[in-house]
Amino acid sequence: ETEVTYVRAGKLYRVRSKGTILAGDNAMIPYICAELPEEQREALLLTDRAVNMMTTVSLRTWESFERLGITGVDSPGMFYNTFNLRTPRHFGAYRPRLDPAKPALVGLQSPSGVLHHRTMVRELFGGNPPVPGTPLREQLAALRTRVLRTLFEDFERRIRKQLARVLSPGGFDPARDIEAITINRWPHGFAMGTNALFDPAEWTGESHPAVVGRQRLGRITIANSDAAGLSLAQAAMDEGYRAATEL
């Protein structure tokens, strides 16, 4: 039997069950489950997440894209290294109208996480990014802070500038055509595996922190993509299945 204690609306509750699966951010588990062995606790605390960010812009029309004959742009030297029109969704018999005079959504992103895009990192750090050779975990921690501290207005200014620079030959006017901007900041974006450049060579096989950290503790099992060290939906599903079958 396991026992879970939680607070809701200022009241303390306690639930008993035959088993519990901890499937949140694995680095938080040592703070939730105090009974963990020290080796497992230390392994879970090594869990790290890559920083990611997804930006969506709502446009009045997408006529500028049509006039330019494009649906998206790769722009590695700009703040976002790619942006494109969101693919219209089909639901059952519903078919969206592909009318350039109608509103559309544009997604701006840096694939594989913010740290992989040098221009965005440099600008977020005010021209002074982490020096080459800085341990990956330190880079991620510093970048996390920068992403959270950057004002929405700073992102908005860069978005308007980038879209205008690329789309203005097609008649795009950011003041007229941008209806709304949504920025999803994921400072703890997605699970990471080990990195041979920075991590100990012995972190392989059964000694991998993800493997050590996901060991069953009585009637408690551990899941989430962190438990696989992979940022894949399939990995999260596999770990969830494993955790459930271990109970």
Model-derived segments and their meaning:
Residues 3-7, 58, 64-247:
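Conserved flavin/dinucleotide-binding core of flavoenzymes
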Residues 2-75:
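Glycine-rich loop(s) and the adjacent beta-strand/alpha-helix scaffold that form part
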